[in-house]
A protein has these predicted regions:
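Active-site loop/oxyanion-hole signature of alpha/beta-hydrolase fold enzymes
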Residues: 15-18, 23-25, 29, 63-108, ...
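Conserved alpha/beta-hydrolase catalytic His-Asp/Glu region
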Residues: 164-223
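Conserved hydrolase catalytic core segment
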Residues: 101-146
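Catalytic histidine-centered segment of alpha/beta-hydrolase-like enzymes
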Residues: 278-290
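Alpha/beta-hydrolase fold catalytic core
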Residues: 1-35, 56-60, 81-82, 99-102, ...
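Conserved loop-alpha-helix segment in the C-terminal half of the alpha/beta-hydrolase fold
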Residues: 235-281
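A catalytic-pocket lid/entrance helix-loop region that shapes and gates access to the active site
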Residues: 133-169
C-alpha cells in the first residue's frame, strides 16, 4: 500500500445547499496564499495526494470534492443532471468562506482545469496564479446541434430516473484497483490500491461503489461555446501555466473533432500564459509524474 507522506484532514462546509467535503493539508499562513486544487470528472480530492506528497515544502492546501463526487453530499432531493455553472458557484462560495480577502493559487485537472480557467477569467481578482492540467474544455459546437442535444438530454435524464445509468460496482477494493490500473496502465499497484480505497466505498451489500453520482453521466443540455470560453480567457489577469501530457489525450478521445492544436489556439488567448509538457505520462499526469509535476508547479507558483 502507498505510504502517505503528508496526511490530510477532512473538513465539511455548507456550500449552496450541500455539505462540501474538503481535504486539507497544512495550516493557514498569512505570508502564503492558499493553494486550491480542484479535481476532474469522476475523480475525488484524494487524487492530489501523490503531487502533494512530492511538494518540497508544507503549505495550506485545500482540495474539495466537487458536488456529486467523493464525500460531498446533497442535503436535498437527488438530482438527475449537473450544470457546469454550478461548479463556478460552488468554488466562489467556498472561497468566500476560506479566504474571503485573499487571492489564491488555483490548480485544476481536466474538468477541474476547465472550471479553474473559466473562474480565473470571471473572478480575476480572486486568482493570484493559475495552473491548468489538461483542462481542455470540449469540441466547438454549432447552433444546429442544439435541437438534438436537448433531445439527448431529455432521453438521458429519463434513463437516469429509471436507474439505467448506474455506475459499475465491484466485488472488493482490489477490483476497484484493477479498474484504475486498466484505465491507466502507468499506475503502480500500491498507488492503485490506495486510490481505490478513496475513490470507492462498500455499500450496504458489501459491493464496492464509485463515490460519484451516476447523474454526472448525463450530457449537458447546453452546447459548449468555444468563442465564449476564449472571451473569458482574455479577461484572466493572473499568470497562467498550461501543462499537457506527452500522450495526446485529445487525439484518443476526439480524433480530429478537437485537436491539441485547437486547444492551444484557444488557451493562448490568456494574456500571461506559459506552456509546458510532461514526459512519459497520460491524462492522469499527477499520478504518472507527481514529482516532476510538483517541481514545475512549485517553480511557477514561486515566480515573481
Amino acid at each position: 500500500m502507498y505510504q502517505v507522506r503528508r496526511p490530510s484532514r477532512s473538513e465539511f462546509r455548507p456550500v449552496r445547499g450541500l455539505s462540501y467535503h474538503l481535504r486539507v493539508w497544512g495550516e493557514p499562513d498569512p505570508q502564503t496564499p492558499p493553494l486550491v486544487l480542484v479535481h476532474g470528472w469522476m475523480d475525488v480530492s484524494a487524487s492530489w495526494q501523490f503531487m502533494v506528497d512530492a511538494l518540497s515544502r508544507d503549505r495550506w492546501i485545500i482540495a474539495p470534492d466537487w458536488r456529486g463526487f467523493g464525500l460531498t453530499r446533497h442535503e436535498g432531493p437527488a438530482v438527475d443532471s449537473y450544470w457546469f455553472p454550478d461548479y463556478l458557484g460552488d468554488l466562489d462560495a467556498l472561497l468566500d468562506q476560506i479566504a474571503p480577502d485573499r487571492p489564491m493559487d488555483l490548480v485544476g485537472h481536466s474538468m477541474g482545469g476547465n472550471v479553474a480557467t473559466i473562474y480565473a477569467g470571471v473572478r480575476p481578482a480572486r486568482v493570484r496564479r493559475l495552473v491548468n492540467l489538461e483542462g481542455f474544455g470540449m469540441p466547438a459546437t454549432r447552433a444546429a446541434q442544439a435541437p438534438g442535444r436537448y433531445a439527448q438530454w431529455l432521453d438521458e435524464i429519463r434513463d437516469c430516473r429509471q436507474g439505467t445509468k448506474g455506475l459499475q460496482t465491484y466485488d472488493d477494493v482490489q477490483g476497484v484497483a484493477r479498474r484504475l490500473m486498466k484505465t491507466n496502465p502507468r499506475l503502480p499497484a500500491d498507488k492503485a490500491q490506495w486510490l481505490a480505497s478513496q475513490w470507492a466505498a462498500p455499500d450496504a451489500d458489501g459491493r464496492w461503489v464509485i463515490l460519484g453520482d451516476a447523474a454526472h453521466k448525463v450530457v449537458s443540455a447546453y452546447l459548449y461555446r468555444a468563442d465564449e470560453a476564449v472571451a473569458v480567457y482574455e479577461r484572466i489577469t493572473a499568470p497562467a501555466l498550461s501543462v499537457i501530457a506527452s500522450d495526446d489525450s485529445l487525439a484518443l478521445w476526439w480524433k480530429d473533432r478537437y485537436t491539441l492544436a485547437d486547444y492551444q489556439e484557444r488557451i493562448r488567448h490568456i494574456p500571461q500564459l506559459q506552456e509546458t509538457a510532461l514526459p512519459d505520462c497520460g491524462h492522469m499526469l499527477h499520478h504518472d509524474q507527481p514529482v516532476e509535476l510538483a517541481q514545475r508547479v512549485e517553480a511557477f507558483l514561486a515566480g515573481a
